[in-house]
Amino acid sequence: MKKVYLLDTNIVSEFSRDQPNPNVLALYEERKDLCAISAITWQELIFGVTKMPEGKRKTYIKKCIEEFKDDFEIIPYDGFAAEICGQLCGRSEQDGKTLPYLDSQIAATAIANGMVLVTHNVADFEEASERSFLRVEDWFDVA
């Protein structure tokens, strides 16, 4: 089945919280077969857990991340996404703006694969949305 939604790191992290956002959980359950994560999100998850101090929380998060790996297709950051990212960042810099690099890579992955980016950090992706065909949804704020 074609994946439609690319989940940002803050959405995936929600699943490991003690009290996850009910809207995020409900929409994920409804659409989980259509969801994937980017290789960049996978990198951010691994980085986050690796730098945590040893303890019960780190052990729990590591377990969650391993389950994520089984639950989500990981969409690679490929040459086409790199080209899109380079264009987005280059155009932004021409206008005196800087796009966050990892967010730019995640946005470019979504664009390259014709996917909707699901994030709670909509503001981080506004510049990319204005300069491209990036579609963004915030599952926290579903009416």
Cite the ranges covered by each PLM segment.
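Alpha-helix capping/helix-boundary segments
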Residues: I11, T41, A81, I106, ...
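Residues that scaffold the ATP/ADP-binding catalytic core of kinase and kinase-like folds
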Residues: E14-F15, G48, C85, A128
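Acidic, PIN/NYN-like endoribonuclease modules and their adjacent C-terminal/linker elements
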Residues: M1-V4, A107-A143
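Short, hinge-like loop/turn segments at secondary-structure boundaries
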Residues: P53-K56, S92-E93, L134-D138
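Generic structural signal for small/hydrophobic residues in well-ordered secondary structure
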Residues: D8-T9, L45, C85, A110, ...
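Short, well-structured N-terminal submotif of metal-dependent ribonuclease cores
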Residues: M1-S38, T50-E66, A143
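Active-site neighborhoods of divalent-metal-dependent phosphate/nucleic-acid chemistry enzymes
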Residues: E73-V116, H120
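Nucleotide phosphate-binding site architecture
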Residues: V12-S13, Q43-I46, E126, E137
